[in-house]
């Protein structure tokens, strides 16, 4: 069964930070689902103006970390700023983290990780204007394309998308291999009659 990635976004996401990683994840064989507290469609930000509407697959009320293998949080200034005020979003992020499932956050999306209180003592990156916020929340901030600390995969900006998406793909493939190894171990323990 293909690994499933939940994407959380609302109006004002950076269009490339949702569409490009989604395309790369799907090309690698993973299923994606876009959830939002905003029903119907949401609009991203593209080249200084509103982008095209994107269809929302599920309402945030209808998703659970139990149903997905990873979480993708696109940035943009408005999107994470709106989402971090929604307790349902923060609870979902906390659930992914407590289950040690990969969480990818790019650009301003690490604001959501701060709100979920999961960056203290961890190495992360993000858009330069939120570095102080991350440091004040106890994170060690690095200025590099991708920072990986346990299940957290963070990135700075749209130019980093290829490396960011690949890190998320690698984490999902590693989880698939672990699942296969666990299944083989269970099969080895079955006695034949």
Task: Label each PLM-derived region with a short phrase.
Residues 107:
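Catalytic nucleophile serine of serine hydrolases
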Residues 1-99, 103, 112-118, 123, ...:
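Extended, subdomain-level signal for the structured scaffold at the beginning of enzyme domains
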